[in-house]
Design a protein with these regions (language model features):
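Catalytic Walker B motif of ABC-type/P-loop ATPase nucleotide-binding domains
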Residues: 154-158
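ABC ATPase nucleotide-binding domains
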Residues: 216-245
Length: 245
């Protein structure tokens, strides 16, 4: 088994005294690829905020086994958190992922940024403002920013909200390569995508239910989402999983 990166035990968290997450325990290991699913308002974003130290737990513990890991977390936010009108170029966005590296010279950051631009296939748009990017281009730009600092843990919050479907398979190929060295936590409402790509799954709906492996079925989903699921086919069910077709 890989080494433990993050250990969360008996976590209670929320806002203004209101509990959003209740008695959460979770372990994340090196090279893990954990998919987090759950209904709106179930606490997925709150859990990520606790891991990122943006909010403090009401009780419980969040322990990084290596203190350096806490300073080496890559984060890719939801698309609605991005101000596309902000006057910044693709290359500048990517280099901003090194802002905490005070010891690095500007020239070194520029060189590292160029390497990441090539790795993500962004050479043709490096000098474009982010407001001119397609969804897929913006997604790759923000992924580059998130991994430029070689994080031990990469957190992706609803990455499918960016995706140009033509580049979806390429995006997950990039994640597969990144996962060889980096643990990944991916939050998504797209349960089909989760099942197809992750190694383990956690359903967050106030409490957390962990499922080792990605071979979940509709009964497990119905129990933890508290609504019907359809595994095969198209329909008007609130959440549905479709096999590849």
């Amino acid at each position: 088994m890989s080494d433990l990166l993050l250990n969360i035990e008996q976590l209670n968290a929320g806002y203004n005294g209101k509990i959003v997450l209740k008695d959460i325990s979770l372990k994340i290991y090196q090279q893990d690829f954990l998919g987090i699913i759950g209904p709106n308002g179930g606490g997925k974003t709150t859990l990520i905020k606790v891991i990122l130290d943006l909010i403090k737990p009401i009780s419980g513990t969040v322990n990084f086994l290596n203190k350096e890991t806490k300073n080496r977390i890559g984060y890719m936010p939801q698309t609605n958190y991005i101000d596309k009108k902000f006057p910044i170029l693709v290359s500048e966005v990517i280099e901003s992922g090194l802002i905490s590296k005070k010891e690095m010279k500007k020239s070194e950051k520029k060189e590292k940024g160029c390497e990441m631009i090539q790795q993500m296939g962004l050479e043709g748009i490096a000098n474009k403002p982010i407001g001119e990017l397609s969804g897929g281009q913006l997604q790759r730009t923000l992924l580059a920013r998130a991994v430029i600092n070689a994080p031990e843990l990469l957190i992706l919050d609803e990455p499918n909200s960016y995706i140009d479907k033509r580049f979806e398979s390429h995006f997950y190929e990039l994640l597969e390569e990144i996962n060889k060295k980096t643990a990944i936590v991916l939050i998504s409402h797209d349960i089909g995508t989760i099942i197809a790509n992750v190694k383990n799954i956690a359903c967050v709906n106030e409490t957390l239910h962990y499922h080792a492996g990605s071979d979940i079925d509709n009964h497990w989903l119905e129990e933890h989402f508290e609504c019907p699921f359809e595994i095969i086919g198209h329909g008007d069910i609130p959440h549905r999983i479709l096999k590849k077709h």
